[in-house]
Amino acid sequence: MEFSQLVERLQTHIQCHSLEKFGDRNPTLGGVAALTEALTGQISYVDSAKYAPQMKTTQASALILPPDAKLQAEADAQGIAWCATAQPRLLFAAAIAVFYQPYRPPAGIHATAVIDPSVHCGEDVSIGPHVVIYPNVTLGDRVCIHGNVVIYPGVTIGNDSVLHGNCTIHERTQIGQGCVIHSGAAIGAEGFGFVPTPEGWFKMEQSGQVVLEDGVEIGCNSAVDRPAVGETRIGKNTKLDNMVHVAHGCRIGEACALAGQVGLAGGVTIGNRVILAGQVGVADKSEIGDGAIASAQTGIHGKVGPKEVVCGSPHMPHKLYLKASAIYKRLPEMYDTLKKLKKV
């Protein structure tokens, strides 16, 4: 594919009107690569001036650059074709999609799949080996189910969703369109509901449901539990990394990102476009406002306001955390000083 053809496809793919190709260079491209690993015939990207030194040694034939005159001049000096956009990383992601498409088996049902006669399949559905689908399941058009997936009764899965190998979808679960469930994930399993008694624990049946709205992605070995009553809901385009736990009754808004090993206790409410970094823990019934960010290993108790950035456990504003951390490092010295003052 010629560079000019790729630029045209990228403009169409993400409806970007600010992408421009400059110069007469029009190399043939066959793939994408990181800036330091790219070879002739590959395209890469640069999103800030700190990568300018790497441009001097890259073998990439083309680059996606920001609107930075110095970077663009460096590309010209190196004889590299380039295009400019305000979002180089986004365009690079679109370029990857041009050259690479995830494996998808052809439409059809594998001979070893066990499917109840009551299951409704849309058009061009792909069902892999050893899949088990219980009664009254509805599969939309172009749904792809890889090997060893188990789908419990009454589940609904929307058009173009993909279920990777060895994931399990429990009863009382609705999955929207264009969702991706990765290997080992469990969606709709019973929430952790037990009532203490003199004898131990009385099991509270979990009769609620789980709803994944359109475009949700669930990482490997993650779990989204259903509640005793009501629903656990994950909003449109929200992404969960591997080993994320969403407990019963949580409500997560749209376009959120939860990194690996995040754990939400029951009844947590999260707004839209919230980012939780790795190993963040959120106590039961906590509330997190739109656009909030929690750094890695933050322990959230109570409320986090909209667009607030929090750190530490228990959580505190980012600036306060930095001050507290600086003091914490000096505690031994301060303690020694205090002991000396006591002796005076």
Curated annotation (Swiss-Prot):
Pathway where it operates: Bacterial outer membrane biogenesis; LPS lipid A biosynthesis
Protein name listed in UniProt: UDP-3-O-acylglucosamine N-acyltransferase
Any one GO CC term of the record: carboxysome
UniProt source species: Synechocystis sp. (strain ATCC 27184 / PCC 6803 / Kazusa)
GO BP terms, alphabetized: lipid A biosynthetic process
Highest taxon of source: Bacteria
Residues the record marks as active site: H248
Reactions the enzyme catalyzes: a UDP-3-O-[(3R)-3-hydroxyacyl]-alpha-D-glucosamine + a (3R)-hydroxyacyl-[ACP] = a UDP-2-N,3-O-bis[(3R)-3-hydroxyacyl]-alpha-D-glucosamine + holo-[ACP] + H(+)
GO terms of molecular function: N-acyltransferase activity; structural constituent of carboxysome shell
Record-linked Gene3D superfamilies: Hexapeptide repeat proteins, MurE/MurF, N-terminal domain
Alphabetical UniProt keywords: Acyltransferase, Lipid A biosynthesis, Lipid biosynthesis, Lipid metabolism, Repeat, Transferase
Its job: Catalyzes the N-acylation of UDP-3-O-acylglucosamine using 3-hydroxyacyl-ACP as the acyl donor. Is involved in the biosynthesis of lipid A, a phosphorylated glycolipid that anchors the lipopolysaccharide to the outer membrane of the cell.
Catalytic EC class: transferase
Family of this protein: Belongs to the transferase hexapeptide repeat family. LpxD subfamily.
Keyword Repressor appears in the UniProt entry: no
Signal peptide positions (record): none
TM helices/strands, residue ranges: none
EC numbers, comma separated: 2.3.1.191
Assembly and oligomerization: Homotrimer.
Disulfide bonds: none
